[in-house]
Amino acid sequence: MIVFLFRGIFRDKSRFLFPISIVTIGVALVVALVGFMEGVFMGMIDMTANLDTGHLRLVNKPFYDEEHLRPLDRSLAAQKETLKWLEHNTNSDIKWAPRIRWGALLDVPDINGNTKLQTPVVGMALDLKSSDSFEVKRLRLVESLLKGKLPLSKNEMVIGNQLAQSLKISLGQSVTVLGQSFDGGLVADNYTVVGFVKFGVTAMDKKMVLIDLIDAQNTFYMEDTVTDWLGYFPPSFNFTNYVDVKNKINFNLNTWIKTPPKDWAKDDIPITLSILDQQNIGSMVKTFTLIKSFVIGIFTFLMMLVLWNAGVLSGIHRYGEMGLRLAFGESHWKLIFTLGIEGLFIGILGSIVGCIIGGTFTWYLQDIGLNMGDAFSKSGLMINDVVRARLTLEGFIQGIIPGIFSSVTGTIIASLAIFKRSEANLFRELEAG
């Protein structure tokens, strides 16, 4: 019987084309909408993680408590030993990267070597020179480089493009970094500006300076010492699991603290934070999740309403067929059951085609992206100019369920009208058709 119904659907275009087209369009739109919204939001999280917080962050609690002061004397020593511990006590798919957050005065000399301009800068030291480092790719420095090159030699730096313009710095110019060392003393070291970058975040473009990790350790007397260990998950890892991983690492840290490395200070207390604990990202996640649920909920409800009406209209046009089948002796409930099976077939077929179309569009936006740099240029959000969608199982589920449910429900509700009409009236509609 099922094969018979299936063949009947394809042979009768009035029962096939319109309902399946409505289901296909609705499911495709939901899959594409969920993928786009998920991609924009996860793009913002990944951008923030890459530039600043990491998905996970191991930091000394005394440093974190006074982070706005960039207290290098509260950094965490035993860099090599810490890396070994992280690799043995955390998930194997987490990639850990050491960084140094520093703050200093940037002194720009005139032709005589005297101070011409000075400004406070926010600095980040990371591994820019190692061949096996992911940091250059992670921060998209090659794509963000407007002029010059990335640091290759000793004591070279790249700075934000707006910072370079405000200080009137040219490529190859020597500048002096004035700051505090790990021991609390004053340091002054000369660097050569070799590149200008555009991060796409106004605050960073105006104040950010990037130098190599080894150069920073030499300048600030921080051998085998860093301020942060940033952990990065693969793109497929959902942010809802960050907290569980963080808690597991903190549990292991409590054991490690009892037998700490010899280079740690007595009051060093390393802690692990997730991105949700920093930069107010946690509250933003809750707000975005609520807004996404509301928008998708409204859209899904409207889609279900349209599909429901499509099922009702399809059923109304088949009242004559229902009367004929009743006249041949088919029972009311068997008739409703077979029509419901047809609605299920239509819902499944439409959902499959809709998933293919919506998934293809989402995959295209995930691979190619959509340039929205002009829209985000003044927003201050840490988000890429090129917005990419994200193909997720959740998007397919949110499209398939209303697609199938609405098709079946609309068909069954329209079919219930046969209880209110006589066979003669239903048969008369067949004659009128």
Each model region followed by its residue ranges:
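Short helix-loop junctions at transmembrane helix boundaries
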Residues: 352-400, 412-416
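Peri-transmembrane interface segments
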Residues: 40, 241-305, 314-316
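Hydrophobic alpha-helical transmembrane segments of multi-pass inner-membrane transport and secretion
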Residues: 13-40, 286-321, 344-357, 401-409
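A structural signal for hydrophobic secondary-structure junctions
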Residues: 61-64, 71-224
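N-terminal Sec/SRP start-transfer signal
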Residues: 1-32, 41, 50, 333, ...
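A short beta-strand structural signal in non-transmembrane regions
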Residues: 56, 163-164, 225-252
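Alpha-helical transmembrane segments
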Residues: 28-58, 63-64, 362-365, 369
